[in-house]
Design a protein with these regions (language model features):
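TPR/TPR-like alpha-solenoid helical repeat scaffolds
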Residues: 97-101, 121-133
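Short, structured interface segments that constitute the first stable element of a domain
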Residues: 52-66
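Structural signature of tandem alpha-helical TPR/SEL1-like repeats
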Residues: 1-12, 22, 33-46, 56, ...
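Canonical tetratricopeptide repeat
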Residues: 26, 60, 94, 128-131
Length: 133
């Protein structure tokens, strides 16, 4: 199935049942992948309003806020994502990067270390090692 066909199928499913959180998330992921941030943001926010404990929505919404330079909001989303799943290495990485961009290096350090522990062979482990010292 092509991405455009999948998006159409998710839209149709949401017409039939606007509370299908999985369809909202999957459609948001498609928009995010196309760099359609406003559409993706609205869908993630709607999914969170229906099911507040959906990790992926918080993490991806944090990525959107980060991409938009809205670091305080990104930080809040990443913190909530970590509350829901403290073992996802990329959340620690992006929270650390966000804290650094906000001038909060001390706050970033434990997340750099967590990233290294959770993803010892991760693509950003050298960067994390430099910042965590």
């Amino acid at each position: 199935m092509k991405v455009s066909e999948a998006a159409a199928a998710y839209r149709k499913a949401l017409e039939l049942d606007p509370s299908l959180v999985a369809a909202l998330i999957n459609l948001a992921n498609i928009h995010y992948g196309r760099d359609e941030l406003a559409e993706a943001q609205a869908l993630y926010e709607r999914a969170i309003s229906l099911e507040s404990d959906f990790f992926e929505a918080h993490f991806n919404l944090g990525n959107i806020y980060h991409d938009l330079g809205r670091f305080t909001e990104a930080q809040a989303c990443y913190r909530e994502a970590l509350r829901l799943n403290p073992y996802y290495a990329d959340t620690h990485f992006y929270l650390a990067v966000t804290c650094e961009k906000m001038g909060l290096s001390q706050e970033a350090r434990p997340h750099w270390r967590s990233y290294q522990q959770l993803a010892p062979n991760g693509e950003w482990v050298e960067l994390a090692r430099e910042f965590s010292e």
